[in-house]
């Protein structure tokens, strides 16, 4: 069973029915035990448009699917503090990609997958200004702030994530 780590930014793999922790998968936080977030391979994944963010509030998980059935290729996780989605490869049980989502604040409502994992859908928790600069008077909230849904495309062959449309 995969369990969200919440504020520790990690995922726990829990054995059932024993409840034993089988593995900790670092995702949105540094993990000194195995060097995650310190190595040349993993440190860039914790870089955001706001700089190096070595922690996050990881909330929800979703397993990849084929024809609506779990296929065991990937596990996707959201970050609530800085709007990001991560992909964990279930062959290696390692985080292989983290994508920051533009025009979003508080990526709580994600990840939701289409039935063949063509898209991961992520919704912003809070409305954001649509001017591209994020600098508009609060008095203009009704006219200038919107909530976005982001559709993150998943490459069929390589599983690479990209913002396809919002």
Describe the predicted segments one by one.
Residues 1-166:
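Predominantly soluble domains enriched in secretory-pathway, periplasmic, or organellar proteins
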